[in-house]
């Protein structure tokens, strides 16, 4: 089969995508496919228009890749691709809107305040919540632009930093606990969750360095959480995946609170990292699936969409 891999891109997650793309291309070649690699840039739209392939594997992360725009273009060109479609991609990228769907699906979310750059006035802003809080851009991944603020001064600095990345930002309650993630796999109506992965960062936070630098985080499979919480996050992950209209695969992140209360969903990743240190491949290993087998499974499921 002739498969094009889109990777790289122009988002803040470009370096991650370059690594994901390399892994995806090597796996596809190992599985016997003819592979065309495209380090994608918006100026290369003509390359997609003229593309003659059986399938596109999207290895992009962040904006202009994970937000539904590339998926929309491929739909217009009638080119099949791996993974979630336009609507599910766009919703998952928009954290504030996605949380509305999660709540409707009965999944616990963090309390939040949403700010917009066009109405925000630093001099008039008055936060009445409890510290610490998490400040983050609405449409960035890999913890880019994220700050944990414990004082008003840190909050104002965090707001300024988040606004550098997005016109809409979230201020969420900070929940102390164990961060876990659940890989979801399957066509619509046939989804299943893979083993829960516990994330143990070497840094204080599971930040960009912890996520992508070798040795900066430990992934424990299965996660060291209670059977009750394991069942909760596995079921909630599938419900969240379905609520947003995701397809084929996604990865859903949670915090399991130290106080024993229900886990809190953080986000759904429709194009999770596929680097050597990524979480989804580790979850797949938990069910005996090699990296190459996982990539081929994505291809097989996408051809049945």
From Swiss-Prot:
Gene3D superfamilies documented for this protein: 3.40.50.20, ATP-grasp fold, A domain, ATP-grasp fold, B domain
Any single GO CC term annotated in Swiss-Prot or TrEMBL for this entry: cytoplasm
Domain of life: Bacteria
Biological process terms in GO annotation: cell wall organization; peptidoglycan biosynthetic process; regulation of cell shape
Catalytic reaction annotation: 2 D-alanine + ATP = D-alanyl-D-alanine + ADP + phosphate + H(+)
Keywords recorded for this protein, A-Z: ATP-binding, Cell shape, Cell wall biogenesis/degradation, Cytoplasm, Ligase, Nucleotide-binding, Peptidoglycan synthesis
Broad class of enzyme this protein falls into: ligase
EC number(s) per entry: 6.3.2.4
Location(s), subcellular: Cytoplasm
Any one GO molecular function term: ATP binding
Recorded metabolic or biological pathway in which this protein acts: Cell wall biogenesis; peptidoglycan biosynthesis
RNA-binding among keywords: no
General function of this protein: Cell wall formation.
Family: Belongs to the D-alanine--D-alanine ligase family.
Protein name: D-alanine--D-alanine ligase
UniProt source species: Halalkalibacterium halodurans (strain ATCC BAA-125 / DSM 18197 / FERM 7344 / JCM 9153 / C-125)
């Amino acid at each position: 089969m002739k498969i094009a891999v889109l990777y790289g891109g122009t988002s803040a997650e470009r370096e991650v995508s370059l690594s994901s793309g390399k892994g995806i291309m090597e796996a596809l070649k190992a599985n016997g496919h003819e592979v065309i690699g495209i380090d994608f840039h918006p100026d290369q739209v003509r390359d997609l228009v003229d593309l003659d392939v059986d399938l596109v594997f999207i290895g992009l992360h962040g904006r202009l890749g994970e937000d539904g725009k590339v998926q929309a273009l491929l739909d217009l060109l009638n080119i099949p691709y791996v993974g979630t479609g336009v609507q599910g991609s766009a919703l998952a990228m928009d954290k504030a809107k996605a949380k509305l769907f999660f709540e409707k699906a009965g999944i616990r979310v963090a309390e939040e305040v949403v700010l917009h750059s066009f109405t925000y006035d630093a001099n008039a802003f008055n936060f009445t919540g409890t510290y610490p809080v998490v400040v983050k851009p609405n449409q960035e991944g890999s913890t880019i632009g994220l700050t944990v603020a414990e004082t008003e001064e840190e909050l104002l600095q965090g707001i300024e930093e988040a606004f550098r990345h997005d016109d809409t930002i979230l201020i969420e309650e900070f929940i102390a606990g164990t961060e876990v993630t659940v890989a979801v796999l399957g066509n619509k109506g046939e989804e299943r969750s893979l083993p829960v992965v516990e994330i143990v960062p070497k840094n204080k936070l599971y930040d960009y360095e912890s996520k992508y630098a070798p040795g900066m985080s430990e992934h424990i499979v299965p996660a060291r959480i209670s059977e009750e919480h394991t069942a909760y996050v596995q079921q909630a992950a599938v419900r969240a995946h379905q609520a947003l209209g995701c397809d084929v695969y996604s990865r859903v992140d949670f915090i399991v609170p130290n106080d024993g209360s229900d886990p809190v969903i953080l986000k759904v990743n429709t194009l999770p990292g596929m680097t050597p240190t990524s979480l989804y491949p580790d979850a797949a290993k938990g069910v005996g699936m090699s990296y190459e087998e996982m990539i081929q499974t994505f291809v097989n499921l996408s051809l049945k969409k």
